[in-house]
Each structure stands twice: as C-alpha cells, then as structure tokens.
A protein has these predicted regions:
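Catalytic cores and adjacent binding grooves of peptidoglycan-active enzymes
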Residues: 13-14, 29-33, 70-89, 123, ...
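Active-site acidic/histidine clusters and adjacent loop/turn architecture
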Residues: 44-123
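Non-membrane alpha-helical secondary structure
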Residues: 3-4, 38, 50, 54
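Membrane-interface motif at the C-terminal end of an N-terminal transmembrane signal
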Residues: 22-40
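N-terminal Sec-pathway targeting helices
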Residues: 3-21
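Mid-length scaffold segments of soluble, non-membrane domains
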Residues: 102-153
Length: 200
C-alpha cells in the first residue's frame, strides 16, 4: 500500500505544480496582452501627429522638379491619416508599375533616391493602405502614406536576385545601402522572412 501512496503523492504534486505554472502563464499572457494593447493604442493615436507632410513648400519643390502629381490634401480613413497626400501617376526618369499615393515629403525622398540609384523602372506592391502591421496591433507605416513596398528595380528582382551575388544582386544591395541615407526605416530580405521578396 505504501508503494502505491508515493506515486500518488508524486502525481498530485506534479498536477499542482503544472496547474500553478499554467495559471501564472495565463495571468502573464493577459498582462502583456493588455500592455501591448495600451502601447499600440497610444502609438496609433500619436503617430499621425509626428508625421511631417512637407506643406506647400514640398508641393512647390515637386512641381519645380517636373513631377506630375495630384494634390489630395490630408486624407483620413478611420485610424489612418496621410498629411499632404499626393498621387503620382508618372515620373520623369522612372517608369512606375502603378500610381503612387504617399505624403509629399516621403514622395520627394523616394524620387531623389530613385534618381540616385538610376532606377529606370520599378515594380511596387503598394503604398498607402489603411491597415495594421502583420501580426501586430500597431498601424503600419502604409497607413500614413510613408511607406512603399518595392519588388523590382530595373531588371533586378528582390525575390530572385537579392541572394544570388550577381550583377542584379549587387545592384540591389547598393540600392538598399543608398536608401538608408534617405529613409528612417528600410527593411530588406536580410531583416525578416516577411520581406523576402521586397524592400519596405
């Protein structure tokens, strides 16, 4: 009988310990979820106020540079806001796969960068899109018109050529290095799997 009691005590102790750990883990998960919700809510509310659209000075500079665009003013949609938004259908030196909708300041930086890397054409996967980041409650920079996803520059495909070490791959790495001097945030395939086929 004694030999049966000891295993029973062990089993009961094991159940108690695992139940306690599960409870603690559950409480911790709820805490961090609440913290994450609080942080994301504050960020989502404050982020639009920190964005600079460039104002009339930016619009004038774009016109002087020969950029054809449509001024959209401030574009609001739910929690999203583009300050001083513009839509660009064509660029003087770079063929676009589709029109761009960005805030003027970001568009100006993009045009300068494309000219610097001698981009004759780009295929992009989108600019403005009122959505959250994948797997996060925080709004994406696309929600504020401050981001573009580029899949191809000239004949160089990010998905096909980034890791091949050839002419196209070397060009893409130089282009990415150049982008860091123009944009505060640049994401490449080296950063995570979500960007295996494009620059952000």
């Amino acid at each position: 009988l004694l030999s049966m009691v000891r295993p029973l005590k062990f089993i009961l102790k094991f159940i108690f310990v695992t139940s306690t750990l599960a409870f603690i883990a559950g409480v911790a998960a709820l805490y961090f979820e609440k913290q994450n919700q609080t942080v994301s809510r504050v960020y989502n509310e404050l982020r639009p106020n920190l964005i600079q659209g460039g104002g009339q000075q930016c619009l004038s500079a774009m016109s002087t540079a020969g950029i054809k665009f449509v001024s959209l003013g401030d574009v609001r949609d739910k929690n999203c806001l583009i300050k001083n938004a513009i839509r660009i259908n064509t660029l003087p030196n770079t063929k676009l796969s589709s029109p761009l909708t960005l805030n003027c300041r970001t568009a100006s930086k993009l045009v300068t960068w494309l000219d610097e890397i001698e981009a004759k054409s780009i295929d992009h996967m989108g600019t403005y899109n009122c959505r959250k980041m994948r797997g996060s409650p925080i709004m994406s920079e696309h929600s504020f018109g401050t981001a573009i996803d580029i899949a191809r520059i000239n004949k160089a495909s990010i998905k096909k050529h980034w890791d091949n070490g050839g002419v196209e791959g070397n060009y893409l790495h130089r282009a990415a290095k150049s982008a860091y001097s123009h944009f505060s945030n640049v994401i490449t395939p080296d950063d995570n799997a979500l960007h295996h086929d494009h620059f952000h």
